């Protein structure tokens, strides 16, 4: 904290951590019904030893530039990042304490350009990687397959205070964001600003 102002060193560390996280996301994460996460799944990707190795790549005065994905074993998948637009986020609360945090998208502006009964149909399938393989010829985790869901960056978030028994108790914040593939970064930076740089 710096009197409520972002600390440049903290901003740098968050940016570099996000570069590393996105490199792994682009390499390994897709519809889990089609592409399993490497190793033991989430436990492998969040293994403390692995995360320490990734964190050691962050230098205090130098940017990683384009981060490379970590080595999580034999997973013959490549990476691709495309642009996304056409997203909105709303958060609503009522007098009874019910809260909803919802991100909605038609993907690109005007979605698929088709309207049914006043609703614009989305073109969410463009969240799949445009190419089925990366530059080396490795198949992409987020490639198109029949019945498969495209990867999404939407991150509607509820922040709760823990209760006495560890269960969620009082609501601290409800948020989300538009922004395509950088929604996750916007949500992280908003949370850090709210919770750490009050």
Describe the residue ranges of each PLM region.
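Alpha-helical support elements that line or immediately flank enzyme active sites
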Residues: 1, 176-197
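Internal maturation/activation junctions in enzymes
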Residues: 2-105, 116
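Intrinsically disordered, low-complexity coil segments
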Residues: 3-5, 34-43, 135-137, 161-171
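Stable alpha-helical elements in mature extracytoplasmic
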Residues: 10-17, 171, 183, 187
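Sec/Tat-exported extracytoplasmic proteins
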Residues: 18, 22-25, 125, 191-195
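Acidic/polar loop patches that form or flank catalytic/metal-binding clefts of enzymes
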Residues: 29-31, 127-134, 173, 198
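Active-site rim segments in enzyme catalytic domains, especially the processed small/beta chain
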Residues: 93, 98-170, 184, 189
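Glycine-anchored helix-breaking recognition loops at helix->coil/strand junctions
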Residues: 143-146, 175-179
């Amino acid at each position: 904290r710096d009197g409520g102002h972002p600390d440049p060193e903290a901003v740098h560390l968050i940016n570099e951590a996000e570069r590393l996280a996105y490199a792994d996301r682009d390499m390994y994460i897709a519809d889990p019904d089609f592409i399993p996460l490497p190793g033991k799944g989430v436990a492998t990707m969040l293994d403390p030893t692995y995360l320490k190795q990734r964190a050691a790549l962050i230098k205090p005065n130098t940017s990683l530039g384009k981060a490379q994905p970590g080595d999580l074993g034999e997973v013959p998948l490549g990476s691709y990042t495309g642009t996304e637009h056409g997203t909105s986020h709303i958060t609503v609360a009522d007098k009874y304490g019910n809260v909803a945090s919802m991100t909605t998208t038609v993907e690109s502006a005007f979605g698929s350009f088709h309207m049914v009964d006043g609703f614009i149909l989305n073109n969410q399938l463009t969240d799949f990687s445009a190419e089925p393989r990366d530059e080396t010829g490795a198949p992409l985790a987020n490639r198109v397959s029949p019945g498969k869901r495209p990867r999404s960056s939407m991150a509607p978030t509820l922040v709760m205070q823990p209760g006495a028994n560890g269960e969620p108790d009082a609501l601290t914040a409800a948020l989300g964001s538009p922004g395509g593939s950088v929604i996750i970064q916007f949500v992280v930076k908003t949370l850090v600003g709210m919770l750490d740089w009050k």
